[in-house]
């Protein structure tokens, strides 16, 4: 048992290359992600067919490892403070097609297949279902959002039942 634990620890701590030079980070062949002070890296997720942005989330070291190995999106939920296998509750699993990392390895872009499903806990295909109008802002009025997606893919009350809403005020 002790050997298995040590083997796992060795694998987990050596999965990503240590950041030792700017050249290696920018031009090197090894994954050396830069996690923030909370141990997170931002992830923008897009639909592999349409190119639409589906969501913005975060991964920690463990969720990135699970995503790579399972080929299904696993994020770090900041609201629940836990690993979040996307679609485990709703059934709308994100099948990973590609993961890219930016030039200084501090942000991820992931393309996924969601079939005919959705990525937003509100029920829309994308978490970016509203648009902010451009132009002159009238200081006496509030900026009104424009809905770009009209129809929800599912009813969140039926899917999530008694689970708490992750949106915080």
Where are these regions (language model features)?
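Short, positively charged and aromatic/hydrophobic N-terminal segments
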Residues: 5-7, 11
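Short, acidic, Ser/Thr-enriched surface-loop or helix-capping motifs
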Residues: 45-48
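C-terminal binding/interaction regions
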Residues: 16-40, 59-66, 71-169
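Hydrophobic "anchor" residues
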Residues: 52-53
């Amino acid at each position: 048992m002790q050997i298995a634990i040590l083997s796992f620890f060795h694998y987990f701590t050596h999965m990503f290359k240590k950041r030792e030079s700017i050249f290696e980070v920018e031009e090197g062949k090894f994954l050396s992600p830069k996690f923030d002070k909370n141990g997170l890296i931002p992830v923008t997720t897009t639909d592999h067919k349409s190119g639409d942005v589906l969501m913005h989330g975060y991964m920690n070291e463990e969720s990135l490892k699970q995503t790579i190995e399972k080929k299904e999106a696993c994020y770090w939920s900041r609201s629940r403070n836990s690993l979040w296998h996307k679609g485990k509750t709703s059934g709308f699993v994100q099948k990973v097609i590609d993961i890219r990392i930016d030039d200084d390895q501090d942000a991820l872009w992931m393309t996924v297949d969601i079939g005919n499903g959705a990525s937003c806990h509100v029920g829309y295909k994308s978490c970016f279902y509203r648009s902010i109008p451009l132009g002159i802002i009238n200081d006496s009025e509030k900026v009104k959002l424009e809905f770009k997606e009209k129809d929800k893919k599912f009813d969140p009350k039926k899917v999530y039942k008694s689970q708490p809403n992750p949106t915080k005020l």
